[in-house]
């Protein structure tokens, strides 16, 4: 295994600091739409206008959350403005998950995860959006992945946080059914959002989301959404074989996979990484981070997304504000070429599409003084980043 080489990265405190309140999530300026689709009405919040041929940043949240609790604080984070000033932003709420949503009528058939992905086509058509860069968490990451598989020409890039590409096995399915009978929906969702360590140690954060899930999300609608997610199909993606002309079912756009090192989704994200094209995929594992990187490590995630989008050629090379005033940050991002059980299957690539990339393909020469930007934009071979 190659020697680890560190790149310094600023430590950022969590965005969520209120204690014991489920009503503190920041507002996000935007125009709300209720869009009719073949599978029901979807609530959308749109900020800014689509610009020419640029894609729109489109988000999709996890179970137990909505666009407000999953993304608003993150998108209002100062350094995210370095990104969002270049794009319109479209937040999707899964049916019935927005705040104040009424209960569905008795007998309502909630959309499957595949149908949720199909609903996005109607959203893009209604809002006259030509393409997207998707940012999804958990269930939302699955929906965006399915949408990218079905509509590759509409998706230019994906940031997938806590993605699980696999269907639940029979044992997991039975366990989830038993949980519905023996536990309340709030605790079930918390167990999927946070790891055991985080549930015990980060009490303020967990309590914030416990109150939000219990007070702000319609419980009946939430149970339908959770059931739909737990009944998902396997994405059936497979890693292309180098030199083979046999077509494979894989995501064709650049992908940034993100997971906290204590997230319950770590194994699932590594499995997803093993199935994706290594020349288009990057795996970012965040140290000291659980199931909500966008809330706990917004600075690191913002920086990674910025360089990911820069590699696609859409935004200029600008310095993030929190890095411009600190010469010796207290956290580090580590470059790690892995060789473990999954070997090449558990690695990703920082290489971006040649047609859009404005970066150098020179061999990475990393030192402790290099920036994360240099690692992302100059690396021509398969790596994992752990920060």
UniProtKB/Swiss-Prot annotation:
- Superkingdom, taxonomy of origin: Eukaryota
Gene that produces this protein? ndrg3
The residue range of the signal peptide is none
Q: Please give the residue ranges the record annotates as the region Disordered.
A: 329-387
Full protein name: Protein NDRG3
- Check the record and name the Pfam families matching this protein: Ndr
Task: Indicate the family of this protein.
Answer: Belongs to the NDRG family.
Composition skew (Low complexity), residue ranges = 359-377
Enumerate the InterPro entries for this protein. AB_hydrolase_fold, NDRG
């Amino acid at each position: 295994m190659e020697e680890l080489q560190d790149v310094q990265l600023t430590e950022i405190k969590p965005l969520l600091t209120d204690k014991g309140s489920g009503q503190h999530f920041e507002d996000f300026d935007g125009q709300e739409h209720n869009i009719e689709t073949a599978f029901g009405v979807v609530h959308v919040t749109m900020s800014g206008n689509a610009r020419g041929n640029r894609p729109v940043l489109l988000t999709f949240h996890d179970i137990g959350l909505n666009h407000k609790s999953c993304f608003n604080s993150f998108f209002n984070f100062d350094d995210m403005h370095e990104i969002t000033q270049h794009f319109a932003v479209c937040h999707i709420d899964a049916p019935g998950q927005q705040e104040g949503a009424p209960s569905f009528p008795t007998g309502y058939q909630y959309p499957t995860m595949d149908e949720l992905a199909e609903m996005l086509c109607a959203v893009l058509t209604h809002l006259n959006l030509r393409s997207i860069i998707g940012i999804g968490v958990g269930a939302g990451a699955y929906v965006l992945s399915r949408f990218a598989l079905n509509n590759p020409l509409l998706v230019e890039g994906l940031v997938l946080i806590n993605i699980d590409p696999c269907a639940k096995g029979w044992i997991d399915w039975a366990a989830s059914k038993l949980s519905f009978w023996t536990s309340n929906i709030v605790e079930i969702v918390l167990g999927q959002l946070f790891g055991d360590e985080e549930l015990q140690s980060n009490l303020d954060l967990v309590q914030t989301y416990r109150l939000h899930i219990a007070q702000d999300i319609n419980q009946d609608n939430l149970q339908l959404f959770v059931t739909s997610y737990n009944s998902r199909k396997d994405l059936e993606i497979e890693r292309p074989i180098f030199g083979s002309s046999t077509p494979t079912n894989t995501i064709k756009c650049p992908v940034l996979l993100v997971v906290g090192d204590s997230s319950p989704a770590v194994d699932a994200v590594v499995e997803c990484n093993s199935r994706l094209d290594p020349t288009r995929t990057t795996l970012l594992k965040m140290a000291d981070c659980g199931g909500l990187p966008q809330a706990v490590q917004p600075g690191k995630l913002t920086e990674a997304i910025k360089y990911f989008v820069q590699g696609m050629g859409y935004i200029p090379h600008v310095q993030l504000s929190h890095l411009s005033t600190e010469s010796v940050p207290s956290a580090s991002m580590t470059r790690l070429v892995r060789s473990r059980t999954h070997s090449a299957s558990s690695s990703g690539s920082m290489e971006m599409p040649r047609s859009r990339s404005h970066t150098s393909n020179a061999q990475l020469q990393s030192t402790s003084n290099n920036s994360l930007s240099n690692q992302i934009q100059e690396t021509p071979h398969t790596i994992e980043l752990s920060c």
